[in-house]
Amino acid sequence: GMLMAATALLAENARPDEAQVKDALGGVLCRCTGYRKIIQAVMAAHDFDAEPLRAETGSAVGTRLNRLDGEEKVLGTDLFGDDVAGQGALVLKVIRSPYHRASFSFGDTGGLLVTTPGLIKILTASDIPGRNLHGVIPDTVDQPVFAVAETRFKGEAIAAVVGDADAVDKFDVSDFPVTWTERPAYLTPEKALADNAPLIHANRPGNILMNGIVQRGDLAAGFAHKDATIAEGDFITGFVEHGYIEPEAGLAQRVGDRLEMHVCTQSPYMDRDDTAAILGIAK
């Protein structure tokens, strides 16, 4: 995003000032940087037009490295998460809660397998051999792989059907044998923090994930400063979803005594550790 926005700007204006660079990059939201180095680099880009900066041969610092997947990416032949499954691979479809909060019970899941050709397995919490929890941050892991008896949010997973691709594709999730009982939901922080609100997790008193300390200086002295500008109001930011460039998909297969996964992820080592804990196997 940064490169595309900067390239578009430099194509129109080879020597932009800081305000112009900020304006051009303003639509690129990035949590990984303070923007300062990027802004400076775009403003200085014209200095390298005549003679590109090249590292000395054999220099460890500054030497340009070829990306392992660079050629495949450029040619469009690289394989993404939804491209790696071979012919005949089994496919999984997750059954999710249609309610914000509900209790549920399963019906005749064994009968579903008998009457639905191509389905070979139904997975529920009882099939989890290890820890029925997952989450990116180890200290706050509390999300079940499959909910047990009650779901806590709309879309929470309760089961998965596994089978050949055609059967799973045609399977209507409304045919899954489950009975739902919708329960009162608390959809705002204020309601969830109320004294009479039920606990989302038994180990989270008051429905509070964690407490922290924010330190600040002398607010009154700051406001009293002659150069201080005070702005008051209610400010709301919208929800921003990452713009994935591929489906969230992947492949898992057994290779010897190892489980090998090909998935799209930002945190492969955390995924590895989580999967090992869920399956009750060594990393």
Features from the language model and the residues they span:
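Helix N-cap / loop-to-helix initiation motif
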Residues: D17, A165, G280-K283
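Ferredoxin-type iron-sulfur electron-transfer modules in oxidoreductases and energy-metabolism complexes
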Residues: G1-E56
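General structural feature for long, well-ordered alpha-helical segments within catalytic domains
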Residues: M2, D17-V21, G34-A41, G70-G76, ...
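A generic local secondary-structure boundary/capping motif
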Residues: L29, G81-V84, V148-T151, F239-H242, ...
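Phosphate/pyrophosphate-binding loops at sites that engage ATP/ADP/AMP, CoA/4′-phosphopantetheine
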Residues: G111-V114, D273-K283
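Short coil/turn connectors at secondary-structure junctions
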Residues: G27, G88-L92, T116-I120, V148, ...
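Conserved beta-alpha junction segments in alpha/beta enzyme cores
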Residues: D78, L219-L279
